[in-house]
Design a protein with these regions (language model features):
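Acidic-basic catalytic patches of nuclease active cores, encompassing PD-(D/E)XK
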Residues: 1-42
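Residues at secondary-structure transition points
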Residues: 19, 23, 48, 72, ...
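Conserved catalytic cores of phosphodiester-cleaving nucleases, focusing on short active-site segments
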Residues: 32, 51-74, 81, 89
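Short, glycine/acidic-enriched loop or turn micro-motifs at the edges of active sites
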Residues: 44-46, 68
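Short acidic/glycine-enriched loop/turn segments that link adjacent beta-strands
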Residues: 46-49, 119
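Structural motif
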Residues: 48, 61-63, 105, 123
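Mid-chain, well-packed structural core segment of small domains
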Residues: 74-104
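Domain-level recognition of nuclease-like catalytic cores that cleave nucleotide substrates
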Residues: 99-137
Length: 137
């Protein structure tokens, strides 16, 4: 298999949305674990709303939205979290907080996972996104 064929097979495997998103979420979860966090939930749902990851970093509850892109279909994953998505994340986080009885310290992170043409992966973490207004950590 030459390099072009290899890239095409990799692109096809990674470009299926369910595969691409799930792999990105697993990579993001692994990064949080390596940093000492505990993953409390993956793909947690409240009605139609979903939080990709819920993690605990020390005493801080972290709600994580993961955006995974391939190099050829790039674009900033962070920019894909538009107002509609932010509203859904707020609703889901409020549902989680209600379910557990609240948390004194929490934050939102957005993690971008970029699968490069050479097969390598770059992960960029945006910590403390102010989806509720002022940060609470």
């Amino acid at each position: 298999m030459d390099l072009r064929q290899w890239w095409e097979s990799l692109r096809k495997r990674w470009s299926r949305p369910e595969t691409l998103g799930a792999r990105g979420e697993r990579l993001a979860a692994a990064r949080y674990r390596r940093a000492g966090a505990t993953i409390l939930a993956m793909n947690w749902r409240a009605g139609q709303d979903e939080i990709d990851l819920v993690a605990l970093e020390g005493r801080v509850l972290v709600f994580v939205e993961v955006k995974t892109r391939t190099a050829e279909h790039g674009g900033a994953g962070h920019a894909a979290v538009d107002e509609r998505k932010r509203t859904a994340l707020r609703r889901a986080a409020k549902a989680w907080l209600r379910e557990i009885g609240g948390a004194p310290h929490w934050r939102f992170d957005i993690v971008e996972v970029l699968v490069c043409i050479d097969g390598s992966v770059r992960i960029l973490q945006h910590r403390g996104e102010p989806l509720f207004g002022p940060r609470r950590f």
